[in-house]
Amino acid sequence: MAGNTFGTIFTVTTFGESHGAAIGVVVDGCPAGIPLKLEDFTAVFNTARPSGTFETARREPNTPEILSGVFEGKTLGTPIAVLLRNTDARPHDYEALKDIYRPGHADFAYEAKYRRRDWRGGGRASGREAAARIAAGVIAKKMLTHYPVLHSAQYTACKADGKPPDGTSAAGENRPQHGTSLPITIQTSAIEIAGIPCAPISATDELPSEINSKLASIKQAGDSAGAIVQCMVRNVPAGLGEPVFDKLEAELAKAVLSIGSVKGIAFGAGFQLARMSGSEANAVDKNHHGGISGGISDGKDIVFQAVIKPVPSIAQEQIMETASGDRITHAITGRHDVCLYRRVMPVIDAMVAIVLADMMLRQGAAQILKV
């Protein structure tokens, strides 16, 4: 099965199925000497663990096992393998579905491609695979924090005249100062849930009462809801991206769209750009292009929005097709989310970090030697 590896230099390969023995990830290309310990993973997984009223009742501890690539608390420069055992799997929940293609899922598509499929919760197509990405994101973020290239003057945002910027180009768009070591930060938040626009809601924020009530009604009806989340990446040095086919937004789009529940992405002002004049779109005190120009980071905040589809596993009766070609009416049982907005956020964070880590390494030794 192809397509399990992402990245060019900093590569991420995930493995395992939703209700198999374990899932995991192998990260290659990470430089040696990066501090990395188990606590780095557990802190992130504690935040990402489903716990709310509108989230799955499946409770995986996600206790990481570092199998290789780390010694005495630092990376070795060799492949890093991290294993996450599945301890709360219930494959029997899906036995009634083994000859049924669930609408909105990858069941039929996988069988059409491979002539067989893992019907236990979707196998590789399950959201469970995302935990392996989160683990890889932990490593990528550590690399971004500690890799010396980030702190060199070569990779800082500069004005067109080559002089260092004065710090701020617009409200919320801070450019890294020349020669400083501002850490890259990735912040993802929901800006619309169940069709209700909202002020940014982080993964740890309480829901506004209006949205909470709407989701409660949707859950009561045995249905699900979608969302729009926004990601803002601050202190990204100017110059990252590989035109023309590996532009920064192209790589970010591929990374984010590879997340199973994401169905759309827009950078900066996104589709609103179609309604703007050139003079409006080019306003230097705005960030309508989302911090990327010509496929290369320009030192402003990178901003994009991602569309999260409604969870396809719902308790309502739906028309479904069977392996024999019949159409039946069936309601899906089991442990499923009402809305994925909170659970998708750490996955987006991880994929963004992976892209930036890879792009930083792709910038090339020749550039580093000029510093």
List each model region and its residues.
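Generic N-terminal targeting/processing segments that precede catalytic cores or assembly contacts
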Residues: 1-151, 155, 182-371
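Short Gly/Ser/Thr- and charged-rich N-terminal loops/segments
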Residues: 154-159, 177
